[in-house]
Amino acid sequence: MSSTSTSSALIHHFRLTTRNLGSPTKQRCPYAVTFCNSWREAGLRYSVTQRRSKGFGPVSALNDDDSPTETTPGVGSAVEDRPPDSSEDRSSSVYEFLYPRKEELPDDKEMTIFDHLEELRERIFVSVLAVGAAILGCFAFSKDLIVFLEAPVKTQGVRFLQLAPGEFFFTTLKVSGYCGLLLGSPVILYEIIAFVLPGLTRAERRFLGPIVFGSSLLFYAGLAFSYWVLTPAALNFFVNYAEGVVESLWSIDQYFEFVLVLMFSTGLSFQVPVIQLLLGQVGVVSGDQMLSIWRYVVVGAVVAAAVVTPSTDPVTQMLLATPLLGLYLGGAWMVKLTGR
């Protein structure tokens, strides 16, 4: 190549017309050349000997025929390129969940990691504020709540005692905390949905509403079932078992520890159909597969009831295992009816 001594301040773009390839002939190679800071940044495909023999500074060469036609998404882009559909597994629901199509993605603006952290901080603050206000409101009516929660065994002649100074006060704080968390849970749920909603596809957004509504309904149904059925049955079993031998004088703190743990664990265990629907929509397991293992589910429901319930009596365990088994079978049929 012929060398031309020209000031770099006057030339911003020039084209190399010929390049000596080490043979008597010369080939014309249209390259767009721009000045760069280093050979590594330039990315020229010259050998070390060729680089040292050049008389000009570092340049970057780009073939006109190889020019990119579209911009590659940069770091922090919310859209991840789909891998090529080279196998049959790529058409599964799991693949569609991990790599959604671009037309399914929402048209929301992208945010930096710092913007996400700031939004998360604000939503956590709102959730904590709502739960704190609910706890204060429940503490103002804590005595009424305690009388309401004592109702399942009041007719059995059970007497509650304060066995240590301040035990009743700390019990009211515990009851207020549980009830405040229960009343503030809708706000927490809303903030979680508002935070993750921009990152969901349109299909996932349509699926989110029924899932949230069903989960909330099942949780409160579990609380009601525990208060009206499970707790009275368990406590009556203990009272009748001790009848004629010892008088039932219960610690107020231990009683509410038992009742509150039983109620909330029952509410959480009622989320089984929601988990099944999520697994079915993602494509991890089908409805037929869920129904085919019903024998193992029976054993698992009994074991789960024994772990979840704070008591060790068989009555409470069977009362909880029965609805768990029914919820599982109902969830499996729902997954099957949805075509999964």
UniProtKB/Swiss-Prot annotation:
It is found in: Plastid, Chloroplast thylakoid membrane. In thylakoid membranes, TATC and TATB form a large receptor complex, containing about eight TATC-TATB pairs, which binds the precursor protein. Twin arginine signal peptide promotes pH-triggered docking of TATA oligomers to TATC-TATB receptor complex, inducing a conformational switch of TATA that results in activation of the translocase. TATA dissociates from TATC-TATB upon completion of translocation. Belongs to the TatC family. Residues 61-127, 201-209, 279-289, 336-340 are stromal. It comes from the Eukaryota. Keywords: Chloroplast, Membrane, Plastid, Protein transport, Thylakoid, Transit peptide, Translocation, Transmembrane, Transmembrane helix, Transport. Residues 1-28, 29-60 form a transit peptide. Residues 57-92 are annotated as: Disordered. Its main location: plastid. Part of the twin-arginine translocation (Tat) system that transports large folded proteins containing a characteristic twin-arginine motif in their signal peptide across the thylakoid membrane. Involved in delta pH-dependent protein transport required for chloroplast development, especially thylakoid membrane formation. TATC and TATB mediate precursor recognition, whereas TATA facilitates translocation. Residues 79-91 have a biased composition (Basic and acidic residues). The chain crosses the membrane at residues 128-148, 180-200, 210-230, 258-278, 290-310, 315-335. GO terms for molecular function: proton motive force dependent protein transmembrane transporter activity. It is a multi-pass membrane protein. GO terms for cellular component: chloroplast; chloroplast thylakoid membrane; receptor complex; TAT protein transport complex. It comes from Arabidopsis thaliana (Mouse-ear cress). Disruption phenotype: Seedling lethality when homozygous. When grown on agar medium, mutant seedlings have an albino phenotype and contain plastid lacking internal membrane structures. This is Sec-independent protein translocase protein TATC, chloroplastic. The gene is TATC. PROSITE patterns: TATC (PS01218). PANTHER family: SEC-INDEPENDENT PROTEIN TRANSLOCASE PROTEIN TATC, SEC-INDEPENDENT PROTEIN TRANSLOCASE PROTEIN TATC, CHLOROPLASTIC-RELATED. GO terms for biological process: double fertilization forming a zygote and endosperm; thylakoid membrane organization. Residues 149-179, 231-257, 311-314 are lumenal. According to PubMed:18930082, TATA is detectable only in minor amounts in Arabidopsis chloroplasts.
